[in-house]
From Swiss-Prot:
TM segment ranges: 15-45, 60-87
Protein's UniProt name: Cytochrome c oxidase subunit 2
InterPro entries per record: CcO_II, CcO_II-like_C, CcO_II_C, Copper_CuA, Cupredoxin, Cyt_c_oxidase_su2, Cyt_c_oxidase_su2_TM_dom, Cyt_c_oxidase_su2_TM_sf
Binding annotation for Mg(2+): E198
Its EC number(s): 7.1.1.9
Binding site for Cu cation A2: C196, E198, C200, H204
Chief location of this protein within or outside the cell: mitochondrion
Cofactor(s) the protein requires to work: Cu cation
Length: 227
């Protein structure tokens, strides 16, 4: 969950988000080292009077600044590709949920159950209870079992939307006429908030997403009551 004046990413709740946080720190360290080197060279150029106006050729320097960037790019690309394949791979999901984007709400269908589907609208500000979050609460939360692989099928009924939950490392476009999929797994129970992350019209800001991750026994009880 985000909080005011937060500078970093949200706390990771899924294995994918943990990997993304590690990759973020890895890449940021490389950027920091490169920036420090460039600033150091600039400071030397500004503070020294030594120049090399007669230098016409420097094979060693050219070799270094060709090979070194290539190595740096490889060090960034390899972990990035690993995470991309992890995000794309879905093996034997325990549950499948289909979500459709609408202007301006989400609808959900649990495809493993016959009649388990509902719409999820934002709760207006004037109807919020004490402690509830403005522009983030919904009338029907998406209840899912924790520590289990869940496949999300995502599409749209009208315009482009994007289904995103930052603490789980999820952001998948909802495209009319196309069915995209992603996978999620929460390692601990709780409420996880997200929003539509694709500008989709005048009420784009009023399409929150709330996932309620619960133990499997609670989920089975909830699903039996909903069907």
């Amino acid at each position: 969950m985000a909080y005011p004046f937060q500078l970093g990413l949200q706390d990771a709740t899924s294995p994918i988000m943990e990997e993304l946080l590690h990759f973020h720190d890895h890449t940021l360290m490389i950027v920091f080292l490169i920036s420090s080197l460039v600033l150091y060279i600039i400071s030397l150029m500004l503070t020294t009077k030594l120049t090399h106006t007669s230098t016409m050729d420097a094979q060693e320097v050219e070799t270094v600044w060709t090979i070194l960037p290539a190595i740096i790019l490889i060090l960034i690309a390899l972990p990035s590709l690993r995470i991309l394949y992890m995000m794309d791979e879905i093996n034997n999901p325990s549950l499948t949920v289909k979500t459709m984007g609408h202007q301006w709400y989400w609808s959900y269908e649990y495809t493993d159950y016959e009649d388990l589907n509902f719409d999820s609208y934002m709760i207006p500000t004037q109807e919020l209870k004490p402690g509830e979050l403005r522009l983030l609460e919904v009338d029907n939360r998406v209840v899912l079992p924790m520590e289990m692989t869940v496949r999300m099928l995502i599409s749209s009924e009208d315009v482009l939307h994007s289904w995103a939950v930052p603490s789980l490392g999820l952001k998948t476009d909802a495209i009319p006429g196309r069915l995209n999929q992603t996978t999620l797994m929460a390692m601990r129970p709780g409420l996880y908030y997200g929003q539509c992350s694709e500008i989709c019209g005048s009420n784009h800001s009023f399409m929150p997403i709330v996932l309620e991750m619960v133990p499997l026994s609670y989920f089975e009880t909830w699903s039996a009551l909903m069907v």
